[in-house]
UniProtKB/Swiss-Prot annotation:
It holds the Pfam family F-box-like. Residues 1-23 are annotated as: Disordered. Residues 104-280 form the FBA domain. This is F-box only protein 27. Predominantly expressed in brain, heart and kidney. Expressed at lower levels in liver and lung. It comes from the Eukaryota. PROSITE patterns: FBA, FBOX. GO terms for biological process: ERAD pathway; glycoprotein catabolic process; SCF-dependent proteasomal ubiquitin-dependent protein catabolic process. SMART domains: FBA (SM01198), FBOX (SM00256). Keywords: Ubl conjugation pathway. InterPro entries: F-box-assoc_dom, F-box-like_dom_sf, F-box_dom, F-box_only, Galactose-bd-like_sf. Residues 23-70 form the F-box domain. Substrate-recognition component of the SCF (SKP1-CUL1-F-box protein)-type E3 ubiquitin ligase complex. Able to recognize and bind denatured glycoproteins, which are modified with complex-type oligosaccharides.
Length: 283
């Protein structure tokens, strides 16, 4: 007989481990190129993380050039106007750190509603409230309010119920030189209405305040009451502060309502989708 042949499995040769890739050291980039790279990072990440990397990065994040580069990417009419304002409306101490444009880019205050919880999605959170009668409650809308983030509303009772927010414009990202530039406007809006079976009254007061919360300008609305049997009437109040006085730093937004039947429960004015929006004047 012939000799037997061994057919054992061939031993596997382990694959060589890949060479570790060398990390890209951004600190070796020229400052001009590093500035371009950082301009593609989200503003909140720049302020919260990139600023902590090293002194060089902190200097770039705290400076003006990075934020002007970010703003320059918006080629719309508002974007171009903002870039012009950012270049011209700077602090007298141009080298002050950190540059206010960082907070401005992170918070994006232009064109968004600065009122928190405008429709009662979070109950009464963010509002300073005074309860009259049986107090404020949140209910679903009886009439659709266009553009509202939620079809819910705040409902008043048989005596005046009041609620208020005071907005700190600098905290929202608007710096003093921009606020005093004469190139912005403040648009306020509120929706109010009634149940079909109960009349109601409504009041609105919006005030522009200085740093000491002294009133510099105001708008008030005192519309006629909505009568009983009204087909769930829903009305819209708007106003634009177009000639902003020097020194405005806060906006106080306050509205109130009650029913006209003096019924226990919640049959009074229904308010929702309140807004305060800062816009750039394009002309």
């Amino acid at each position: 007989m012939g000799a037997s042949v061994s057919r054992g499995r061939a031993a596997r040769v382990p694959a060589p481990e890949p060479e570790p890739e060398e990390a890209l050291d951004l600190s070796q980039l020229p400052p001009e190129l590093l500035l371009v790279v950082l301009s593609h990072v989200p503003p909140r990440t720049l302020l919260g993380r990139c600023r902590q990397v090293c002194r060089g990065w902190r200097a770039l994040v705290d400076g003006q050039a990075l934020w002007l580069l970010i703003l320059a990417r918006d080629h719309g009419a508002t974007g171009r106007a903002l870039l012009h304002l950012a270049r011209s409306c700077q602090s007298p101490a141009r080298n002050a750190r950190p540059c206010p444009l960082g907070r401005f880019c992170a918070r994006r205050p232009i064109g968004r509603n600065l009122i928190r919880n405008p429709c009662g999605q979070e109950g009464l959170r963010k509002w300073m409230v005074q309860h009259g009668g049986d107090g404020w409650v949140v209910e679903e809308n009886r009439t659709t309010v266009p553009g509202a983030p939620s079809q819910t509303c705040f409902v008043t009772s048989f005596s005046w119920c009041c609620k208020k927010q005071v907005l700190d414009l600098e905290e929202e990202g608007l710096w003093p030189e921009l606020l005093d530039s004469g190139r912005i406007e403040i648009c306020v809006s509120d929706w109010w209405g009634a149940r079909h079976d109960s009349g109601c009254m409504y009041r609105l007061l919006v005030q522009l305040l200085d740093a000491n919360q002294t009133v510099l300008d105001k708008f008030s609305a005192v519309p006629d009451p909505i009568p009983q049997w009204n087909n769930n009437a829903c009305l819209h109040v708007t106003h634009v502060f177009s000639n902003i006085k020097m020194g405005v730093r806060f906006v106080s937004f306050e509205h109130r309502g009650q029913d006209t039947q003096f019924w226990a429960g919640h049959y009074g004015a229904r308010v929702t989708n309140s807004s305060v929006i800062v816009r750039v004047r394009l002309s």
